[in-house]
Structures are given as structure tokens and as C-alpha cells.
A protein has these predicted regions:
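Extracytoplasmic entry segments of secretory-pathway proteins
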Residues: 2-106, 255-298
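Extended boundary segments
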Residues: 93-141
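Extracytoplasmic/periplasmic soluble domains downstream of a signal peptide or transmembrane helix
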Residues: 7-11, 24, 30-42, 121-292
Length: 298
């Protein structure tokens, strides 16, 4: 018996090493696909909630958001979304604005260039930044308007989700879209600050300030990839939403992402199935060989 185990041990260890290696290799992809599934479900739930509303509801929530923006005036914040403390926002005025599902989702952002769609949550707590984009408290709510500047933050380089990992691929002229209630707001990238020290509050504050007559949205994340000692800011200014042309870009992005997600999922399942089948065949063969040796010894 001991001799048989000694013979099998190298194969077992090799199999375990292979499985561990496969797990490490597949984890980022599997985790990202899992997060994208939940992000898609969150966006779908938001769209269903919005679809059940009528024009009066839209108008009421939109006016509340514009009133909130008027009351806060110029952006007020500590300069870094990732240093904001997590607060219990439920019951606050901020939480009640642009929150049709009472789940903290105020809309979602679509970035066709990098094939990314993320729900936008109230605030930038760590819990929020792990699963989507967060609206930076103290900046304008993302409903547009002259003299408004909304800041949306998300992590970059998480092993479990891509989020804003690829926004360094954006260049001036690229567009992104903010979906809020029954409206789609289009923004064109016009400024990129690729490397700002996280403690350089003067530069960060200047980059995210309100500018009279302008309607801005800034995408805020950490950099360099995996180091996170600096901040990357991608700013876009409001441009007309071209309806059919822009919808085509959004639809193509969504369809392409769905196809990629399914192919990746099927590939992972196929590899897992192949490993399982191989292991089962090995077990069956070993049992047959063991039975044969026992019968031969009788």
C-alpha cells in the first residue's frame, strides 16, 4: 500500500500544483467577470426602476438634484477621493437626491473606448470603490449644467475588477456618457493629468474646481498601476448627445463586452471541465488497475 502511494504521490502533487497555478491564473478573470455580472445586474435594476417612473417623477428628482448643486455652490472637498472617510449617508439629504431605488445608485457611466459600464454610487467609501464608480461628495451631482463639475472615482488595478484600470487609454477627443434618470449626458475628453501626487491638494483642487460657463465631469483614479502613489484625472466637457450615433457606440460597446464575457466564461468552464474529466478518468483507471491486481493475486 505504501509503495502504491509513493508511486502516486508525484502525480498527485503535480496535479495539485497545476490546479493551484490554474486558480491563480484564472482568479483575476473569473473575479472580474463575476463583478461585471453584478455591475450589469445593478445597472439593469436601475434601468427597470427608472422605466417605471413617469415624467413627473423625473422632473421632481432632476429639480432636486439641480437645487442641491445650487446649494453647494463651488466644489468643496479635501482634494482626494480616496482619503474621504466612509460615512453613513442613509437619511442624509445627499442620500435622498438622485436615489430612485434607495440603494445608493444615482446612474451609471459608459466608456465605449475601454468597453466599460459602471454603476455610479453615492460617495466614495471603500465598499463603493470595490464594486463601481463613486460620486465624490462635495462636487456637483452629475446632472450637467453650466458652472458644474462632477467628479467620479473608481479604483484601478484591483485583481478582482477592472473598474477604471484602462482609463489611461483615453485620449483627448474620446467620449464617455453619464446615464442619469431618463437622460444621457455626453462628455468629450479635453484634459488628462496623468501623474498628480496624491498629497498635491492645490493641483487636485484646481483640476476639479467649477468653471463659469463650463459643464465638466472628471474621472478620478489612482496611478501608477499597482503602486497607487499618484492620481490620474481625465476630464471631459459637455457635448451634444447625438442620439443614434452615440447610441450605436454604446450598443456596440455593450454587445462586444457581452460577447467577450460569454467567451471568457465558456473558456474557463471548458478548462475546468477538462480538468475534472481528466481527474475522473485517472481515478477510474486507478480503481480498475487496483481491482485487476487484487483479482490477479487471488
Amino acid at each position: 500500500m505504501k509503495q502504491k502511494w509513493k508511486q502516486k504521490l508525484p502525480g498527485i502533487l503535480l496535479g495539485l500544483v497545476f490546479l493551484v497555478g490554474l486558480g491563480i491564473f484564472a482568479y483575476p478573470t473569473v473575479a472580474d467577470q463575476w463583478n461585471k455580472y453584478h455591475q450589469s445586474r445593478a445597472i439593469a435594476s436601475y434601468e427597470e426602476t427608472v422605466a417605471d417612473m413617469d415624467e413627473v417623477d423625473y422632473q421632481k428628482l432632476w429639480e432636486m438634484a439641480e437645487e442641491y448643486n445650487s446649494q453647494i455652490g463651488n466644489n468643496t472637498f479635501d482634494g482626494d477621493a480616496f482619503s474621504q472617510e466612509e460615512q453613513n449617508m442613509r437619511g442624509s439629504k445627499y442620500w435622498s437626491v438622485l436615489n430612485p431605488g434607495d440603494n445608493g445608485i444615482m446612474g451609471y457611466i459608459s466608456i465605449p473606448k475601454i468597453e466599460q459600464r459602471l454603476p455610479i454610487y453615492h460617495g466614495t467609501s471603500e465598499a463603493v470603490l470595490q464594486i463601481g464608480a463613486g460620486h465624490m461628495f462635495g462636487t456637483s451631482l452629475p446632472v450637467g449644467g453650466e458652472g458644474k463639475h462632477s467628479v467620479l472615482a473608481a479604483h484601478r488595478g484591483l485583481p478582482s475588477a477592472k473598474l477604471f484600470t484602462d482609463i489611461d487609454q483615453l485620449v483627448e477627443g474620446d467620449k464617455f456618457y453619464v446615464h442619469v434618470l431618463n437622460k444621457v449626458l455626453a462628455y468629450e475628453v479635453d484634459q488628462i493629468l496623468p501623474m498628480v501626487e496624491k498629497d498635491d491638494t492645490d493641483t487636485l483642487t484646481e483640476a476639479m474646481k467649477n468653471v463659469e460657463g463650463e459643464d465638466y465631469v472628471t474621472l478620478f483614479t489612482c496611478t501608477p498601476y499597482g503602486v497607487n502613489s499618484h492620481r490620474l484625472l481625465v476630464r471631459g466637457h459637455s457635448v451634444p448627445y447625438n442620439g443614434e450615433d452615440d447610441e450605436k457606440a454604446i450598443a456596440n460597446e455593450s454587445m462586444l463586452q457581452t460577447v467577450k464575457d460569454y467567451y471568457m466564461l465558456y473558456a474557463i468552464l471548458a478548462v475546468a471541465a477538462a480538468i475534472l474529466i481528466t481527474v475522473l478518468i485517472k481515478i477510474i483507471r486507478d480503481r480498475k488497475a487496483s481491482r485487476g491486481s487484487k483479482e490477479g493475486g487471488k
